[in-house]
Amino acid sequence: MLFESTRGGDKAKTFEEVLLKGLADDGGLYIPTEWPKADIRKLQECNSFIDIAKLIVPLFTESSYKKEEVITLLENTWHDFEKSDLVGIKKVNEDIFIGELFHGPTAAFKDFGLQLCAAFFNKALEKNNQTAIILGATSGDTGSAAIDACKEYKNIKTFMLLPEGNMTDIQRKQMTTVNQENVFVLNINGTFDDCQDIVKSAFKDKSFLKHDQVLLAVNSINWTRIIGQICYYFYLCMKINNFSKQLCFSVPTGNFGNVFACYSELKLVLPVKKIAVAVNENDILHRFFSKNLYKKELVNETLSPSMDITVASNFERLIYDFYLERDAETCKNFFDNFPNSPISLSEDVWKKTYDLFCSSSIGDVETTEIMKKIYKDFNYVVDPHTAVGLCVSKIFGGPISSDLVVLSTAHPGKFLDSLKLAEIPTFEKHHTLSEVLNKEEYSYSLEADQDQVFNFIKRNNH
């Protein structure tokens, strides 16, 4: 199992190379050269999330690590979860299940991918006698999950860029209250896209690194994050019907990594009936899946801030594998020229959308109404992102009438103002969220300027 770039420049890379590089040298994203096949019969014999992970993760890591090494690593990877089996499942009615992915230490689905990344980062760095810098950007949950996953590894320093805007107090304080010498939280006077641009430029520059250091990617472009997310799709299918029936998945998304993990599950073995791409009014993905137009627009602040993104960084993987059938030259041309040139596919190619995907986009008013209805009718509290995912259900006028699994990507306790708007008086608290509100904050303020950020890293890289 080796990996290649979506733009054709990097080929035959090992898992460890892809883990440590994140972004390919040609600007593309890594993807397996061939999709491995999971053993459905062995999956049906699994009893836990860890059992699933022990079958799935080694399919992607064999070029760098023995299976026994990986299994040992996985036994200690996911920690501080509320639930012993990591994922919760809520049956709303006969047609709708909610996959609760928020029981980890930072109350968001990103704990799954980032704890796996951190464990493999540490393994690779120890093996190669290296240290590392993590430079990441966050619109909500990535930063806290990355900081929490990596803070105990002293060979890793984390610098996290926080944009101005719509992050909740709890989301921000999950990062700014971490007081450790290897963690730096930078408040950036700019948008999330400005922060993403600085991170991307860092992987081309790297002048702030010491000679024995590597720069690591924790944003959703890192393939290892995708692997961690693939595992919970298999787990949900095992728990709901033990792989006996096709399911539809509704995925609230911004950067498209969670959607691509669902698509990857399909490529490994599992028949997925439909993937619903659910977004808020930042609707670049909905415009593509409904109108064949992928065009960057200005970002709008919403009640679901983790989806307030105008460019979906993982979308390139789907274009390359699903639509273009691995035509790297065309993919490179599309994304080398984007966002200056919007992307539209030929009609014959784009029509493949109907085979697997549907999409939806809703605003804050509809989001709040869904939160209200779910609480009133089912006595269940969802956060705004999960509400966006629920809009594809037939009970809210959406296209999917049965066998629907909606991913709940964040705990509702992160979004207290949204709960007030939805007139939801009480909810089950998460074990870590209330702790951060009264802690002292530690952070630094910088302009959205790559030189300022790089110089800050240099001054603190000792």
Regions found by a protein language model. Give the residues of each.
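PLP-dependent amino-acid enzyme catalytic core
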Residues: 1-462
